[in-house]
């Protein structure tokens, strides 16, 4: 199993798909990385040579922000928006959609489940 950027890539998958399992690398970026290293996208991870794995590791770890560093960067960006008190920061703080979506209806993923009002479970009645 090849280990790149702290992620174990599954041996039986194509390298093109396996690279997308690294946080911060999508389909397009994976294709560009493989093009730069000269590796065929249809190659399975188990068929990669040590030299090819090292070339991938060099490009990803030295030239890209991935995994924990990227997660930290995103979290810090959101924290900065909240700290400066801008509109987007307020939306993040209130747990509402940030990019202008409607909230009168929908937005349930961001707002969470509806509060349950006036719903009681039926229990045993006294005196029965």
UniProtKB/Swiss-Prot annotation:
Residues 101-128 have a biased composition (Basic residues). Residues 98-128 are annotated as: Disordered. InterPro entries: Rbsml_uS13_C (IPR027437), Ribosomal_uS13 (IPR001892), Ribosomal_uS13-like_H2TH (IPR010979), Ribosomal_uS13_bac-type (IPR019980), Ribosomal_uS13_CS (IPR018269). SUPFAM superfamilies: S13-like H2TH domain. Pfam families: Ribosomal_S13. GO terms for cellular component: cytosol; small ribosomal subunit. Keywords: Ribonucleoprotein, Ribosomal protein, RNA-binding, rRNA-binding, tRNA-binding. Coiled coil: none annotated. One of its GO terms (molecular function) is structural constituent of ribosome. Located at the top of the head of the 30S subunit, it contacts several helices of the 16S rRNA. In the 70S ribosome it contacts the 23S rRNA (bridge B1a) and protein L5 of the 50S subunit (bridge B1b), connecting the 2 subunits; these bridges are implicated in subunit movement. Contacts the tRNAs in the A and P-sites. Belongs to the universal ribosomal protein uS13 family. Part of the 30S ribosomal subunit. Forms a loose heterodimer with protein S19. Forms two bridges to the 50S subunit in the 70S ribosome. This is Small ribosomal subunit protein uS13. It comes from Thermomicrobium roseum (strain ATCC 27502 / DSM 5159 / P-2). The lineage of its organism: Bacteria, Pseudomonadati, Thermomicrobiota, Thermomicrobia, Thermomicrobiales.
């Amino acid at each position: 199993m090849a280990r790149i950027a702290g992620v174990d890539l599954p041996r039986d998958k194509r390298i093109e798909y396996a690279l997308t399992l690294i946080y911060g690398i999508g389909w397009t970026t994976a294709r560009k990385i493989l093009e730069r290293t000269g590796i065929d996208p249809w190659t399975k991870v188990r068929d990669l040579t040590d030299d090819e794995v090292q070339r991938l590791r060099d490009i990803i770890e030295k030239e890209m922000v991935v995994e924990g560093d990227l997660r930290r960067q995103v979290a810090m960006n959101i924290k900065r928006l909240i700290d400066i008190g801008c509109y987007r920061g307020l939306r993040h703080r209130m747990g509402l959609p940030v990019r202008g979506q409607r909230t009168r209806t929908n937005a349930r993923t961001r707002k969470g489940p509806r509060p349950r009002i006036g719903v009681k479970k039926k229990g045993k009645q006294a005196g029965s």
